Curated annotation (Swiss-Prot):
Reaction equation(s) it catalyzes: L-glutamyl-tRNA(Gln) + L-glutamine + ATP + H2O = L-glutaminyl-tRNA(Gln) + L-glutamate + ADP + phosphate + H(+); L-aspartyl-tRNA(Asn) + L-glutamine + ATP + H2O = L-asparaginyl-tRNA(Asn) + L-glutamate + ADP + phosphate + 2 H(+)
Cited NCBIfam families: gatB, PRK05477.1-2, PRK05477.1-4, PRK05477.1-5
Gene3D superfamilies per UniProt: 1.10.10.410, GatB domain, N-terminal subdomain (1.10.150.380)
InterPro entries: Asn/Gln-tRNA_amidoTrfase_suB/E, Asn/Gln-tRNA_Trfase_suB/E_cat, Asn/Gln_amidotransferase, Asn/Gln_tRNA_amidoTrase-B-like, GatB, GatB_C_1, GatB_Yqey_C_2, Gln-tRNA_amidoTrfase_suB_CS
Family: Belongs to the GatB/GatE family. GatB subfamily.
Name of the protein described by the UniProt record: Aspartyl/glutamyl-tRNA(Asn/Gln) amidotransferase subunit B
Subunit structure: Heterotrimer of A, B and C subunits.
Organism for this UniProt entry: Picosynechococcus sp. (strain ATCC 27264 / PCC 7002 / PR-6) (Agmenellum quadruplicatum)
Length: 496
């Protein structure tokens, strides 16, 4: 079997992401139309978002607030003065033939986002800072629905749904600091966590609430000059982002090594074939003929607004991860699992605040409760019948010796389905742990007397038989024996 020759040149990828985050405001960015997803086509429209002559846009202040809060969370510079611009191009889903966006004076500049990369979930993560060039506000375009194909090319006809037109977006542009598909996917996920923690959007990629375009080029390691940049679109999951980038890196390296040209173009990721293919030549910013939006006044962020919005910022996922490690002694893996979803983090903190041991709560949340939520697709931890205070009660019943871990596991399914007080369930069913030394000694004597041959075998060196005796005793006590005390008594009596 032939072995591929090693590459003579080592290459590195230069990657930047343009991320569009759809905001969850009740109304659109420049009019009062609803932003409700899944409404009947063209039902959430008006003369403003359809671009009729003689109408004037008015900025939704919640959009400005969301942009500033996101900028603060990215530790960026907030511009006290900025403006809107018209980005002009033609497409069937753009009724005005221009998009209101921001060009040379964005609301946010010069931020950064720290990501954590681990080869394996159990490995300690490596932290890396990704620069954020800018964040700006803009309106979304409509949505094309193609008949006979999932794209315009090949379709017999297309319908336009303008409900999405005018939905507020934040476009977040990273520096070209990303070097792999894995880093890009983690950067996008950390952005989504921030969006959700701030409460400004849901970040659902499947619904288009979070969309990422990738700009990627390669160059030999050590070379300062960038290679030809290619844009990739049509990735609707984090795994698709990673796979598309990994594929494109290999495609570009192969092209360079075989002397094929790399064109500055837009390529689409095709999930079914797991490859990218050319869509069109890449447009430069000059093609859009930007100029200031004459129908909107300049934007001013006052010191009072900035102070108010900064005071309302929640603890970020990164801040929580750091605090959980230092305050509770949790592993980096556990902190990442707990903080991936804000509701899970708040559930964990509520259980700890109710007096439960943080590490024990972590085990229950990341294992048993997580398994239950995964099994019941659509169920969230907020809707879980077992409330955080009840989980704390269960953990404390184990901690103070009232019940064993085995009993806790037995009553957990009922608690997950119906909720209720673990203590009340234990008391009503007589499930309290047997911790009376005299009672346990009598039971041990009975079991040993009923199995004299195995006792002799144990004393002759077959010490693994202790597990047999423990099993018999747990069966005898219906799992209610204090395991630690039981093992102490059993070991003492087996030694004779």
């Amino acid at each position: 079997m032939a072995v591929a020759a090693p590459r003579k040149t080592e290459y590195e990828a230069i990657i930047g992401l343009e991320t569009h985050c759809q905001l969850n405001t009740a109304s659109k960015i420049f009019c009062h139309c609803s932003t409700k997803f899944d409404s009947d086509p063209n039902s959430n429209v008006c003369p403003v978002c359809l671009g009729y002559p003689g109408v004037l846009p008015v900025l939704n202040e919640k959009v400005l607030e969301s942009a500033v809060k996101m900028g603060l969370a990215l530790k960026a510079k907030i511009s006290p003065y900025s403006k809107f611009d018209r980005k002009q191009y033609f497409y069937p889903d753009l009724p005005k033939n221009y998009q209101i966006s921001q060009f040379d004076l964005p609301i946010v500049e010069h931020g950064h986002l720290e990501i954590e990369i681990a080869d394996k979930p159990s490995d300690p993560p490596v932290k890396k800072t990704i620069g954020v060039t800018r964040l700006h506000m803009e309106e979304d375009a409509g949505k094309l629905v193609h008949a006979g194909s999932d794209r315009l090319a090949g379709s017999t006809y297309s319908k336009v749904d303008f409900n999405r037109t005018g939905i507020p977006l934040l476009e977040i542009v990273s520096e070209p600091d990303i070097r792999s598909g894995k880093e890009a996917a983690e950067y996008a996920q950390e952005l989504r966590r921030l969006v959700r923690y701030l409460g400004i959007g849901d970040g659902n990629m499947q619904e288009g609430s979070l969309r990422c375009d990738v700009n990627i080029s390669i160059r030999p390691v050590g070379q300062e000059e960038f290679g030809t940049k290619v844009e990739i679109k049509n990735m609707n999951s984090f795994s698709a982002i990673q796979k598309a980038i990994d594929y494109e890196i290999e495609r570009q390296i192969k092209a360079v090594e075989t002397g094929e040209p790399i064109y500055q173009e837009t390529r689409l990721w095709d999930e079914s074939s797991q490859r990218t293919f050319s869509m069109r030549k890449k447009e430069g910013s000059s093609d859009y003929r930007y100029f200031p939006e004459p129908d909107l006044p300049p934007i001013e962020v006052t010191p009072a607004q900035l102070e108010k919005w900064a005071a309302e910022l929640p603890e970020t996922p990164a801040q929580k991860r750091e605090r959980y490690e230092t305050e509770y002694g949790l592993s980096s893996y556990d902190t990442r699992v707990l903080t991936d979803d804000r509701d899970v983090a708040e559930y964990f903190e509520a259980a700890v605040a109710a007096g439960a041991d943080p590490k024990q709560v972590t085990n229950w949340v990341t294992q048993d409760i997580a398994a239950h939520l995964n099994k019941n697709v659509g169920l969230t931890i907020v809707e879980l019948p077992l409330k955080a205070t009840q989980l704390a009660e269960l953990v404390n019943l184990i901690h103070d010796g009232t019940i064993s871990g085995k009993i806790a596991k037995e009553i957990l399914p009922e608690l997950l389905e119906q909720g209720g007080s673990p203590k009340a369930i234990v008391e009503s069913r007589g499930l309290t742990q047997i911790s009376d030394t005299g009672a346990l000694e009598a039971m041990v004597d009975e079991v040993l007397a009923a199995n004299p041959e195995k006792v002799e075998q144990f004393r002759a060196g077959k010490t693994k038989l202790q597990g047999f005796f423990v099993g018999q005793l747990m069966k005898k006590t219906s799992g209610r024996a204090d395991p630690k005390l039981l093992n102490q008594i059993l070991a003492q009596k087996l030694r004779g």
